[in-house]
Amino acid sequence: MSALAISCPSTSKARGRPLGATALAIRSAVHDLTDTYERMTVRQVFYALEVAEIVEKTEAGYRQVQAQVLRMRREGLLSWEFITDGTRWQRKPESFDTVEDAMTMMARTYRRDLWQAQDMRIEVWLEKDALADIVTGVTDEWDVSLMVSRGQSSATFLWRAAMAAQAAWTQMGVATFIYALYDRDAGGRRAARTIERELPEHAPGVPVTFTLLGVTDEQVEDWQLPSRPGKQSDPEAGKFDGRAVELDAIPPDKLIGLVEDAIMQHVDPRSWAIEQSIEHEEREVLYELVRQAA
């Protein structure tokens, strides 16, 4: 369903000012994107429009897209929810009006650990928090940890991840599989290598399998992903071979598909269905407690 609040207008004015040809083309293209995708980041919209040759592959082109998207939202032409932003967030403890409300929420959100019958655990590592809202729908559905590193992972973040893998192995004999989504540039490759190297160093003897899920060389060629100039400020920029491609250049549906396919290859359908059935029964027990309390 389209994320537009109302249909795209034919007027060539915005707030009384005439819109140029590029601005109109951007608005029309964004309108079309809402028919295909539920949510996107501004940078994903930019790459889609750059591939369509509506804007140039420059920071000026990005700012044009950013400006029109913001104006469309303020003018009521684009749902505020269409553009996702995982870079800002708030913390607040969850609270309830009544005990009954708390019990109802507990029953509604109850999740059984469906992976306990799969003898493994999965983590999806993501370089950019701006893309977290795109990926989290899949990771939440499959009850998989989404590890957002925001570029280079901190030593603490890596150590905690290694300790979680170690605990799973020593306590339950569960191996860890890591799927990493990082830019194809010097910084992204370095961040991915660090994960692959340091987790086993912190947890020697623990089976940790690392896979670079994206952006891969094959994806760049097969999907004709747009590139960008490499970050020359990176100390390893001169050593990086090939075109720099941001994770945002992967269309949302393909990004979601990558994650889901990676997860599903580890799922045994029969045991998963059994665990889901048990989960349903346990949730009904909780709902019965709510009814009795009422």
Identify the role of each PLM range:
Residues 185:
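Acidic, divalent-metal-coordinating active-site segment for phosphoryl/phosphodiester hydrolysis
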